[in-house]
Each structure stands twice: as C-alpha cells, then as structure tokens.
C-alpha cells in the first residue's frame, strides 16, 4: 500500500475514532455514570476450567465488576449531557493567589526534606509520598486535559513539576482507568520505567504496552509486600470506563500503605458507602486518609461516584482516620460547583464529624509537608 493510502486510512480512522471519542468524553472523561449496571445476584459458586471457586461479590459473571454490597445504585436517570457541558464550559475560573507555590520552590523543598517522610501535592490526585525510604507516586496525571486526544476537561493549574523533573520513584499506585487518573501521555513518557506498578485487575496491559518492567494487578483485599511496605488494595464506591463499550471491565480501588506502625490510605475516587464502616473496623485506625472532596455537582448524577466535602469527612470518620487530606479539587474543571468551594466546605464541616480544623488537611499545589507535621 502506498504512503499516500496509508496516510489517508490513518486520517479516516482518526476521524471515526474522534466521533466516538466525542460521545465517550462525557461518559468517561468527566467521571459521570451513564447507565445502571448494578447487579443483584449474590456471591455464588461458578465453574471455570472444570474447577469450582467462589466468585467474590464484586466479580460479575460477564467479567465486569461492581461496587461493594450495599452501595448506592445508579438509576436510569437521563442526564442532560449537552446542558451540563455548556454550563461547565461557561464557568470562569479565577485561581486564588497562593493556590500553588512558585515552581522554582517545589524541587528545592523536596530536596531539603529528602531524609524525612513527606507528602507533596503535584495537583488533582497526583501526590508524591515518601515513606520508609520509598518514593510513591499516585495516579500520575500531567496532561493539559483529561480525555482522549485533545478532548476533555482542561487544567486551569499546571502540575507543580514537569513529568521530566519527577524524582526517581519506587512505586506507582493506580486507582482506576478514568482519564484524570490514568494519563496516556504521562504513562508513555514516564521517566522511570523500572518503577513497580500496582494497578487494579485487567489494567496491567496498559503499562506493559508502555514498557514498564514490573507491573502487578491487584484484586480487593489482596496484599503486596514492597520491601518494608505492605500495600493492601481495598474497595471503593466508583466505576470504570475508558472506551465506548468497556464500562466496569477493569476494577477500581484504594491502597492502604503500612509502614512500621503507620497506616496511610490513598482512596480511589469514591461516593459514600457502608463499606467504609467495615473497612474502618477491619483496618482502622488509619493515620492519614486521602479522600476526594471535589466534582460533586450536579448531585443527582455525581452522588454515585464522588463524595462531597461533608461526605468525605464522614468517610474519614467511618474509616477511623485521624487526619483526612482533601484531594481531587483545584486543578481541573469537571463539574458545576465553584472549583474553590470544596476546601471551604471541607474545613467548615470538620467539627460536624468529630475533627478539629487541623485534622482536615489541605495542600497548596507543589507544597511538601512532613508526615510528622501532618500528624502533630
């Protein structure tokens, strides 16, 4: 086939895919549910390769996954996509002074505390966590938009550092496959491909295709020892989708990191749910819990997948978390609330859930705090 025909086919395919992506965008890039996929069957014995096993509740017979038992179930509400998108795009974002620290201060502050256990907010859900001599990165999102190609909600604040400036990382934690968490370009250009990756079931191929060397899929309640760290993958009330027909075909979840006597929980995007009382009973008390506090309006659709600030604090209380770090705000416009409303409501609601204001922890983008400082 000639080069001309190759090029023509490429643009034809790209055009077809772009049309699909436009439809996909509202469903997956903004993390908004589309239809009700909640099953009602109980855990049961099924047969596979002539061997029987007990299928966990969150595993469905068709190979997809569902939320923990007792979670809020989506109805078949027909969401006004175009009205939502128009309203979201009409929001004018004014970034408050001091929301991000100067970029030339980010790496020096990290270096100055290199012998301490620290947490640094890169933006949105991307953090660097240094604990037990290991550097962990969570849901690396560095692209200018959350979506395929150049589509999807765009950042209004840049990452605290460039991807190329990222310090050597030992462990990458991925919670789920939405575009504001699983960033194709960041994955492709990640500078440390020897980093150990922990990801939910059915997502390892994504990393292997980009030549990561050590990729490990995890199911809920599975544990992984990473030298002196113990990491446990735990449930969350969310969903997954990246393409038109792949709803809930990959798992989602949170990571509990244990080192010596400290416990840090990095939550997947989540709605409130009874599961957090159970997790608190089994795994609590937890020293620090990272919980999403943004992207909760309009409530009639966001309530199925994103907690609001008060619900985030309720989740923290149910987990028996001593400190709650508010994340998933102040970086990208994904919903209809004022993008700087979440932290105000987060602090204002702290006492309603048994926390002092200092227990509801907020970062500036690029800021580094020591874990000792957070827990004091």
Specify the residue positions occupied by each region the protein language model found.
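Cap/insert and terminal regions of metallo-dependent hydrolase folds
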Residues: 30-35, 41-47, 51-63, 68, ...
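Metallo-beta-lactamase
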Residues: 29-153, 157-163, 199-266, 287-294, 345-367, 371-375, ...
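Active-site metal-binding motif and surrounding structural segment of the metallo-beta-lactamase
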Residues: 151-198, 214, 284-290, 294
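Divalent metal-coordination and catalytic microenvironments
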Residues: 129, 139, 176, 183, ...
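Catalytic core of the metallo-beta-lactamase
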Residues: 126-132, 225-286, 303, 307-311
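Bacterial N-terminal signal peptides that target proteins for export
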Residues: 6-19
